[in-house]
């Protein structure tokens, strides 16, 4: 059997995940079984570990005596068009199996959220420096005040609870102060200022990956999400085709790069 070996990178978790899932399509087009090996990433505790297998079941079996392995250099990012959301959803459903212990944690949070929860993803910290990595100025974070205005509008129409996913301690405090016990969130590593969680903070790398994966999966099971430009929220949209969203970078800055998921 011939395999396509898909490696990791030093990018953030869902940048790496998005590229990996996109590369499953390359495997299909070449009639190869994908084999994912995430080594020397930001999320392995040991450089010899396969971090993919911390979080997901391996996509295919591998027998070094029988299998021929082809390496794919880099990742395949699908184009920004509506069919990409449908195709990413198909690839996730076909190839991605989240570890049961992680699914159990997600299910517990979703149960506590009740019916039709509102998801809010507020990406701050090093996202303020996104222009240094090739993003436009319009991709910088939207203010918490504007997020709160959109949350208020949504909560006027329902008594839903709010799941907040954020990398920023100050954002967490501001949202708790405003919405009290309607806010549910996870216990995870958060930062302040412009410090990146995955580049600048110490801590268990494996846990950092699990925490952002749980955030994404819970967001994907909400009724509607309020988001900015981020692969975390984008992948939540890929996971669930029924999920709707408000992209505040698009609404307030005309940054339409992720509008294809709403087409």
Residue spans of the language-model regions?
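Short beta-strand scaffold positions
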Residues: 164-166, 227-228
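Secretory-pathway glycan-assembly enzymes, especially type II membrane glycosyltransferases
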Residues: 2-161, 172
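Donor nucleotide-activated moiety binding/catalytic core segment of transferases
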Residues: 185-222
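Leloir-type glycosyltransferase catalytic cores
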Residues: 62, 251-263
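Catalytic lobes of large eukaryotic enzymes
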Residues: 150, 160, 170-198
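Short active-site oxyanion
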Residues: 158-162, 222-225
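Alpha-helix capping/helix-boundary segments
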Residues: 168-171, 231-232
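A donor-sugar binding/catalytic signature common to diverse glycosyltransferases
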Residues: 12, 17, 21, 212-255
């Amino acid at each position: 059997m011939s395999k396509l070996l898909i490696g990791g990178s030093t990018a953030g978790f869902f940048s790496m995940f998005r590229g990996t899932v996109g590369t499953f399509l390359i495997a299909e087009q070449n009639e190869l079984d994908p084999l994912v090996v995430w080594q020397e990433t930001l999320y392995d505790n040991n450089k010899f570990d396969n971090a993919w297998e911390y979080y997901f079941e391996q996509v295919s079996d591998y027998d070094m005596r029988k299998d021929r392995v082809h390496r794919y250099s880099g990742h395949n990012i699908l184009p920004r068009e509506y069919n990409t959301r449908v195709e990413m959803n198909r690839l996730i459903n076909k190839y991605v199996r989240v570890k049961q212990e992680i699914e159990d944690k997600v299910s517990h949070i979703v149960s506590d959220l009740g019916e039709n929860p509102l998801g809010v993803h507020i990406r701050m910290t090093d996202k303020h420096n996104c222009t240094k990595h090739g993003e436009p100025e319009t991709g910088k974070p939207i203010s918490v005040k504007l997020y709160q205005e959109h949350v208020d509008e949504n909560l006027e129409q329902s008594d839903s609870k709010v799941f907040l996913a954020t990398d920023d301690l100050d954002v967490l405090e501001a949202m708790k102060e405003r919405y009290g016990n309607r806010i549910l969130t996870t216990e995870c590593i958060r930062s302040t200022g412009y410090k990146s969680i995955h580049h600048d903070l110490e801590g268990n790398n494996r846990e950092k990956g699990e925490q952002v994966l749980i955030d994404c999966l819970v967001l994907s099971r909400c009724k509607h999400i309020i988001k900015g430009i981020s692969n975390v929220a984008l992948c939540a949209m890929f996971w669930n085709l029924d999920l709707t969203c408000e992209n505040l970078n698009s609404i307030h800055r005309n940054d339409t790069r992720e509008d294809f998921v709403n087409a």
